[in-house]
Amino acid sequence: MDWRVLVVLGPILIAAGWAGFNIAAAAIRQVQGFFNKEA
């Protein structure tokens, strides 16, 4: 692996992981709210 590849991909992977984490957390909250309404 070339260090320049890591320099370019590192921030992109961090941003993608952070976005995915936030999307998953929001989706879980929505699902929990849905089940709470159904109960």
Curated annotation (Swiss-Prot):
GO terms for cellular component: photosystem II; plasma membrane-derived thylakoid membrane. The chain crosses the membrane at residues 5-23. It comes from the Bacteria. PSII is composed of 1 copy each of membrane proteins PsbA, PsbB, PsbC, PsbD, PsbE, PsbF, PsbH, PsbI, PsbJ, PsbK, PsbL, PsbM, PsbT, PsbX, PsbY, PsbZ, Psb30/Ycf12, peripheral proteins PsbO, CyanoQ (PsbQ), PsbU, PsbV and a large number of cofactors. It forms dimeric complexes. Loosely associated component of the core of photosystem II (PSII), it is not always seen in crystals. PSII is a light-driven water plastoquinone oxidoreductase, using light energy to abstract electrons from H(2)O, generating a proton gradient subsequently used for ATP formation. Belongs to the PsbY family. This is Photosystem II reaction center protein Y. It comes from Crocosphaera subtropica (strain ATCC 51142 / BH68).
